[in-house]
Regions:
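Conserved acidic carboxylate
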Residues: 9
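Charged docking surfaces used in two-component/phosphorelay signaling
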Residues: 16-24
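Short hydrophobic/Thr-rich beta-strand motif most characteristic of the beta2 strand and flanking loop
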Residues: 26-33, 41
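Acidic catalytic/metal-coordinating carboxylates
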Residues: 34, 60-63
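Active-site residues of response regulator receiver
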Residues: 53
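Alpha4 helix (beta4-alpha4-beta5 surface) of REC/receiver domains from two-component response regulators
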Residues: 63, 85-102, 107-111
Length: 118
């Protein structure tokens, strides 16, 4: 699916904001609230863009990020990391297209997401 975006964020309120922002940028969006569910979904499809929280239940964002980078199906997938942890942001900065420090506004994410469209 060319315009598929995954929002992998366990905070339901923040996830809803991310979903609306991605939809406003023209993506078909799926929200996933759990790292284990994200692992399963990533085996089924390679989205155009992923918004990835680093602190997730069951499987953390760092583990998902390693899996994404190890899979050639994701070579064109853009990654936006979202974290409130400045240390994690620095550690993983080179593994993502963009690292956002929470809190993140609707307009920030919408505008950044729109940059990655075909």
């Amino acid at each position: 699916m060319k315009n598929l975006a995954l929002v992998i964020e366990d905070d339901e309120d923040l996830s809803a904001i991310f979903v609306k922002a991605m939809e406003a940028a023209g993506y078909q969006v799926e929200a996933i609230l759990d790292g284990q569910l994200a692992e399963k979904r990533l085996k089924q499809a390679a989205p155009r863009i992923i918004v990835l929280d680093m602190h997730l239940p069951h499987v953390d964002g760092a583990t998902l990020l390693k899996q994404i980078h190890a899979n050639p199906n994701f070579k064109d997938t853009k990654i936006i990391l979202a974290t409130a942890d400045n240390v994690l942001a620095e550690i993983y900065r080179d593994k993502a297209n963009i690292v956002l420090i929470k809190p993140i506004t609707f307009s920030q994410l919408r505008d950044l997401s729109a940059r990655f469209k075909f």
